[in-house]
Amino acid sequence: MPINIPDDLPAASILESEKIFVMNENRARHQDIRPLEILIFNLMPSKVETETQILRLLSNSPIQIDIDLLRTETYISKHTSQDYLQHFYKTFNEIKNKKYDGMIITGAPVENMPYESVKYWKEFCEILDWSLTNSFSTMHICWGALAALYYHYGIPKHPLDEKISGIYAHVPLEYYHPLLRGFDDVFYMPHSRYMTVKESDLKGDLKVLARSEETGPAIIMSDKLRQVFVTGHLEYDTMTLANEYKRDLEKGLHPVIPENYFPDNDPNAAPKKLWRSHASLLFSNWLNYYVYQQTPYDLLKIGRS
């Protein structure tokens, strides 16, 4: 799928070096089709890394996509320059009158805080409310998933005895569900979190589509098929967990070595990426079956989910 992003976005050169089709703005303007409008609400400190990971996965389909990047306005990121944020990112006030075919809400490194103590919680809740009427389908990732389950359904998060960090085996619970089409009987997903949700707490119109014995529910979807909650990080690069581990070591946090990740459990050994194909499948299936096939041609007709 050609993704239409600003010509000078750093992710563009990275993706082009990987032979991923990135369409420049001028060429996109001359395409006689309606592209999918996708909003990425990026809450991660490493903006460029997260943008690149998600854009890489959105590129695996034949439909053109226009991307908007959204940042918080009530909290200013300390890890990304203001010039960068102002150049490439929009605030909620700038996009709140717009409709989107799909939206992705990332994780955030704030999971040990009570939700209401997060500096941008009020703004985050306003955007969650807005997403119900202005995004046809929304995918929530890690903290974004836990926080949305809490806000929309009142489902609490539960602290873990120690951080879940590593690559874990998962099983699909509904093999023929369109979101999991093409998934193997066992697939692998990275996790990196201190909190979880209990399957017994999931209620209402929520359905668990995939789970892990070690990490619990991993892919959850609403019965209306417009909200997806992924508790892990299929978007992660090969070295993301290694970089997190080394970062925490340098901070003196005594992190556990990510499970099932480094060969022979040796942090100096190069890890293998075991989740690449299923990451592509999940994002491609979501885009095809729950965005492209379902969203109205006239975006103004998108209503409450």
From Swiss-Prot:
E.C. number(s) listed in UniProt = 2.3.1.31
Disulfide topology = none
Which reaction(s) does its UniProt entry say it catalyses?
A: L-homoserine + acetyl-CoA = O-acetyl-L-homoserine + CoA
Task: Indicate the residues that form the catalytic site.
Answer: 142, 233, 235
* Keyword hit for Acyltransferase: yes
Which subcellular locations apply to this protein? Answer: Cytoplasm
Which keywords does this Swiss-Prot/TrEMBL entry list?
A: Acyltransferase, Amino-acid biosynthesis, Cytoplasm, Methionine biosynthesis, Transferase
Q: Which SUPFAM superfamilies match?
A: Class I glutamine amidotransferase-like (SSF52317)
List, alphabetically, the InterPro entries matched. Answer: Class_I_gatase-like (IPR029062), HST_MetA (IPR005697), MetA_family (IPR033752)
- What coarse category fits the chief subcellular location reported for this protein? cytoplasm
Q: What class of enzyme is it?
A: transferase
Named in its record, the pathway it takes part in is: Amino-acid biosynthesis; L-methionine biosynthesis via de novo pathway; O-acetyl-L-homoserine from L-homoserine: step 1/1
- NCBIfam families from the UniProt entry: metA
Q: Under what name is this protein listed?
A: Homoserine O-acetyltransferase
